Amino acid sequence: MKNKIAVVTALAGIDPAKAHPLYDIKFDTADYYIFTDQKNLAIPNGWNKRTLYPAFIDKKYQARRACRMVKQMSHMLLPDYDYYIWHDNINYVGEDPNKIVERLEENDMAFFEHPIQNGWINEMMGARRREHPGLVDRTITILKDQFQIPNDLPVWETTAFVRKNNKSANECCGIWNDLLNNLTSRDQVTLPAAIYLTQAKVGTLPGRAIAAAGNNEILPNLSLPLYFNGLTP
């Protein structure tokens, strides 16, 4: 049976002139969707555009939260697919999506290892520069005291990942989204807790997710993924 695969990304709160351009589609074995609040964003052939309405109490980071909602809840927005490949808008799919979903094997989800941090508490400390400090402290307190999340859980890179549309993956992403809505918008920090609480099966993708400079130019020396940026293993 043919896999039904959706490649999903989102872009909000950015001037279209400054946004990293979407890539031209290389593989026709998936459907491609971008959720955006930009009416005049240039969309290459083959992409399906969906309107995104950022509306959160956290006005400073509402665009981030809106995009994270798409990332985490693709199974609600696009329910008729077997698999979802998420990537931030600076990435592109450089391998046949059918091969990417095969890398899941028996797992519900698969992520790249985080290139720097080795625990969610360490990542949380780094998030202070890009988040409301009080919300950082509240997140740590709730995850540790209320949910007893161990300090040494691994941190995953969430720039790009692949997941199934099944009960375990959907529950994990639902909890992940609930944590994000109530706590920090830094989704790398709350993902380990969602995995721990739901016991979803998670695999590791080879390589690392892509990195970008502040001007949205991709830095080749920081780009080490083997499958999402078109390089070969």
Go through each PLM region and give its residues.
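N-terminal anchoring/stem segment of glycosyltransferases
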Residues: 1-67, 77-80, 182-186, 197-200, ...
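Residues that flank catalytic or metal-binding motifs in active/ligand-binding sites
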Residues: 3, 28, 71, 156-159
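A residue-level signal for conserved active-site and pocket-lining positions in enzyme catalytic cores
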Residues: 7, 32, 75, 90, ...
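Hydrophobic/aromatic beta-strand patches that form the interior of the parallel beta-sheet core
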Residues: 8, 33, 48-50, 85-87, ...
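Short His-Asn-centered micro-motif
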Residues: 8-11, 35-37, 87-89, 95, ...
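GT-A fold catalytic core of metal-dependent nucleotide-sugar glycosyltransferases
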Residues: 72-125
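Acidic, glycine-rich loop-and-strand cores that form catalytic or ligand-binding grooves
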Residues: 108-147, 151-152
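Catalytic core and acceptor-binding pocket of nucleotide-sugar-dependent glycosyltransferases
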Residues: 133-232
